[in-house]
């Protein structure tokens, strides 16, 4: 029984040590000025991966703030706190979508450049929102 626990702990520690650097390492995407279509495709895929990481970080911060605000709501009895926070999250999602859409439309009819612009916009705005979520209550 003890041996199984040691094996389990070792396996979990190994998995955790393998997973942490990949999550913690920032993903940098670069695109040359006169890039070929294959390079643009690779850049777009890199932006997709970066956007996924940024959205995961955002989701973690939203969950953390939701938990904190729920506790604060139960302490104070103010039932508007959490609902206002959730409304602000929805408003932020709409703002990012619309703001990046008009930037996308500016780059049309060049579809590749438009997609890159949209993804870069979404990443930048999500990172800005994460910084706001990190601000202490």
Model-derived segments and spans:
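Bacterial N-terminal signal peptides
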Residues: 9-18
